[in-house]
Regions:
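C-terminal His-loop and adjacent cap/lid subdomain of alpha/beta-hydrolase
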Residues: 33-153, 161-536
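Secretory targeting and sorting signals
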Residues: 2-32
Length: 536
């Protein structure tokens, strides 16, 4: 296998995509009513809810009575020192977002829809806090604009969790909901993230704390130090694969036994991805392609072993970074160590996939050796009270009492398809038990299926290579990969589906639905599609 160089380093997801919309100054304290500029054709209003969360409203002169309430995604609750890839220089902000982008907001305003959104009172995991804020914001908006007839809740990432949460807890306040690339329950998603960081620590750098951070500034320094160490590992692995794709060197920080280092380090990457449920397609690596011009045997090796390792590496980089923020934030919120893997059966998690990805894992002996090492090392043990507190920070029932659109990319490395599938499974279970319950209560109607799940599925092949045969990660992330990687057309199509549902009390269906999602691009409605379940 020839050596190669990346055109540029692996792409990391930005912390957040804040809107570049000019709005009037944001109040820092709560006020009784919004401060509106009275401009036309679009009036902008700002204010703060009783918890101090700033909000923004934008209302067109031809307001049609429907307002979209947007909930933004995860933002770290601590500043990040400069120099850390993807996140360096971030400062904590509660700037409100009334929509996913300026282009989408503009399209909605042009059609007579109003938009609004909060910056929320706290960043990090904030599901319960955000729920209270959104409830108050809806009330504030309706009092300011009494001609409002419909409220549509939507959001992405953690904001997708919040939109689904609002639909479950207070369906009387909204007419439809959109939960995009959503997070699942607080404990489940946090465990998934922490699993990834713990496995990186286990295989590649045991000095990574991965939790149990100290109090005060010392703990903050430890968490930021973990970020640096994670990206050092990622850089080392990337360099090792570039020099020797078949058998890349283990990072210098790794302390695994010398005997285990006979297994290619790339196989440990693949195992981490499989153990945590990360997709085996990433923004730039499809797990099937090879550079042109390679001998047949080398091309097959690249397809079966190297490309999957690069996909795992790109996805792990994003998952582990978020894990550091999440672990630290939840330890601050709960007052103790909440992550626990003392009862985790790691081998059971890959009972089937180890055969599917046997080449990428370097065979059965290598897989057994890697799993044996994971089983033998000391485990993370939680404070039961802290773990219970995390579980109380937000849980979905999956029961949607208003029409709800779900949409995610199946190769999202942060909140993958399994997160959306968990909502579908809960909703299906509710429908299954509700029909006999209705019959027993002499209710002749079946429970209404309010979920419309849509999927973004990547192409089978999309990895690009330079003329020299090196992977090219400078191109845009492939649709269906990366976190909340949606186009303006896709966001607009979702918004239109939500407007139809709000007006009609049910989803668009049949030919009109299929036509709309086809025109949006990379949007699939398939009743038979079932995404993999979460690993924990």
């Amino acid at each position: 296998m020839r050596n190669f160089k990346f055109k540029r380093s692996l792409t990391l997801i930005a912390v957040t995509s804040l809107l570049s919309i000019t709005i009037v100054s944001i109040p820092t304290v709560a006020q009784a009513a919004p401060a509106c500029d009275g401009k036309s054709p679009v009036q902008s209003c700002v204010g703060a809810t009783s918890d101090g969360a700033p909000y923004s409203m934008m209302v067109p002169a031809n307001f049609n009575g429907t307002v979209y309430l947007w909930s933004h995604g995860y933002r770290p609750n601590v500043p990040v020192p400069a120099g850390i890839p993807g996140y360096g220089g971030y400062t904590v902000t509660n700037t409100p977002e009334p929509g996913p982008s300026a282009a989408v907001i503009g399209a909605l305003l042009a059609k007579g829809f109003a938009v609004m959104g909060s910056g929320f009172a706290r960043q990090g995991w904030n599901a319960n806090s955000a729920l209270k804020t959104n409830i108050e914001l809806i009330d504030t908006y309706k009092k300011q604009f009494p001609k409002t007839t419909k409220v549509i809740s939507w959001g992405n990432s953690l904001g997708g969790f919040q939109s689904q949460y609002l639909a479950e807890k207070h369906p009387e306040l909204i007419n439809s909901a959109g939960a995009l690339c959503l997070s699942s329950d607080a404990l489940a998603i946090s465990d998934t993230a922490a699993d990834a960081l713990w496995l990186i620590k286990t295989f590649f750098d045991p000095t990574i704390k991965a939790g149990n951070y100290s109090a005060g500034t010392a703990g903050y320094a430890e968490a930021m130090g973990d970020l640096v160490k994670v990206f050092t590992v990622i850089g080392s692995m990337q360099a090792g694969i570039a020099v020797n794709p078949t058998a890349p060197a283990w990072p210098a920080t790794s302390k695994v036994p010398d005997a285990l280092k006979a297994v290619p380090s790339r196989s440990a990457l693949v195992l981490i991805a499989l153990l945590t449920g990360l997709p085996m397609q990433s923004a730039h690596f499809d797990s099937t392609s090879a550079p042109a011009g390679l001998p047949a045997a080398n091309a097959l090796s690249f397809q079966l072993a190297i490309n999957p390792a690069l996909a795992a590496l790109e996805n792990i980089a994003n998952a582990a970074a978020l894990a550091t923020f999440q672990i630290y934030d939840l330890e601050l919120q709960t007052g103790g160590v909440w992550y626990d893997n003392t009862a985790t059966d790691w081998a059971a998690r890959v009972a089937d996939e180890r055969f599917i990805w046997a080449s990428a894992l370097s065979g059965e002996s290598a897989t057994n050796a890697l799993l044996g090492y994971v089983a033998a090392v000391p485990k993370a043990k939680a404070n039961p009270d802290a773990r219970a507190k995390v579980a109380a920070l937000g849980t979905h029932t999956g029961i949607s009492k208003v029409p709800t659109v779900l949409y995610t990319g199946v190769a999202d490395p942060i909140l993958g398809a399994s997160q959306q599938q968990s909502i579908i499974d809960k909703h299906d279970a509710y429908l299954a038990q509700q029909w006999p319950a209705n019959r027993e209560a002499a209710v002749k109607k079946r429970a209404v299926n309010n979920l419309l799940p849509l999927w973004g599925i990547p192409a089978e092949k999309y990895t690009k290579f330079t003329a020299a045969g090196s992977p090219d990660t400078s191109v845009a992330a492939t649709p269906g990969t990366n976190h909340c990687n949606f186009t303006t057309k896709q966001y607009t199509a979702i918004a239109e589906l939500l407007a139809y549902a709000a007006d009609n009390g049910k989803h668009l269906s049949g030919g009109p639905l299929l036509t709309k999602i086809r025109k949006a691009g990379n949007m699939t409605y398939d009743r038979g599609y079932v995404a993999p379940k979460m690993k924990n």
